[in-house]
């Protein structure tokens, strides 16, 4: 199984309070994340997306197939993407780590932005942490690793923003933090899932050890609007 059109589904179900809408396109508020969803990747969908992005604005989307060039859009970056689901695995117990795991919140947002800018786990904005439960590890008071929740659809929550400062790799921080986030998800009776670049073999190996299995192969694309359109209409 896989979660079909998961960004669109999230913005039409459990995360409507973060949504901005224009016809058959949805996006998260810009300070939350740049992720956007289309009912269908057709002319109407991209017209709605242009409405949301605004002139020169960017949008990050998930697609079943590689992005095909369209008028009014500049392709910025993209890559093959995997969706992985953990229907079983180690979400109910913490992986071994000597580090103390701390819950993160509003006051930690500047450091979270700094860490994600260094490690590039995916789109992360000043309000991304509002999407769910975020945890981190500090070394000498500095945030060096983190993980949290992002997309939410009925019965499922995504583990996201899993990242570790390069100076602290190999200490088991990612697995420990993911396991804590997965524990919280399972305590709510939900199933963890995630997305990862298909070429990130180091991360995929960690996720497989935690019990995640591949559910979908697709693509992500970051696009920049070159059209002149109206402003988005809030949901």
Model-found features: residue ranges?
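Conserved acetyl-CoA-binding loop-helix of GNAT-fold acetyltransferases
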Residues: 44-49, 170-187, 204-209
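Conserved active-site alpha-helix within GNAT-family acetyltransferase domains
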Residues: 67-73, 175, 198-216
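A conserved beta-strand-loop-helix scaffold within acyl/acetyltransferase catalytic domains
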Residues: 123-165
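Conserved catalytic-core motifs of GNAT/GCN5-like acyltransferases
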Residues: 76-86, 195, 213-228
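Short amphipathic alpha-helix that is part of the acyltransferase structural core
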Residues: 1-4, 89-122, 233-235
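Acyl-donor-binding surface of acyltransferase catalytic domains
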Residues: 1-95
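A short, internal acetyl-CoA/4′-phosphopantetheine-binding micro-motif in the GNAT/acyltransferase core
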Residues: 36-39, 162-169, 197
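Conserved beta-strand-loop-alpha-helix junction that forms the acyl-donor binding cleft
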Residues: 61-66, 184, 193-204, 220-231
């Amino acid at each position: 199984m896989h979660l079909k059109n998961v960004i669109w589904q999230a913005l039409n179900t459990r995360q409507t309070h973060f949504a901005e809408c224009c016809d058959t396109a949805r996006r998260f508020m810009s300070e939350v994340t740049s992720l956007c969803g289309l009912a269908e990747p057709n002319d109407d969908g991209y017209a709605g997306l242009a409405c949301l992005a605004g002139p020169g604005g960017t949008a990050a989307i998930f697609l079943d197939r590689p992005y095909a060039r369209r008028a009014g859009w500049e392709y910025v970056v993209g890559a093959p993407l995997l969706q992985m689901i953990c229907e079983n695995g180690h979400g109910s117990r913490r992986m071994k780590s000597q580090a103390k795991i701390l819950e993160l919140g509003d006051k930690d947002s500047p450091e979270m932005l700094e860490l994600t800018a260094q490690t590039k786990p995916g789109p992360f904005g000043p309000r991304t942490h509002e999407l769910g439960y975020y945890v981190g590890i500090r070394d000498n008071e500095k945030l060096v690793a983190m993980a949290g929740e992002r997309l939410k659809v009925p019965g499922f929550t995504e583990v996201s923003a899993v990242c570790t400062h390069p100076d602290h790799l190999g200490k088991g921080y990612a697995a420990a933090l993911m396991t804590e986030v997965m524990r919280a998800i399972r305590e709510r009776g939900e199933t963890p899932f995630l997305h990862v670049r298909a070429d990130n073999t180091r991360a995929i190996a960690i996720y497989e050890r935690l019990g995640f299995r591949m559910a979908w192969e697709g693509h992500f694309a970051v696009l920049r609007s070159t059209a002149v359109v109206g402003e988005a209409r809030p949901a």
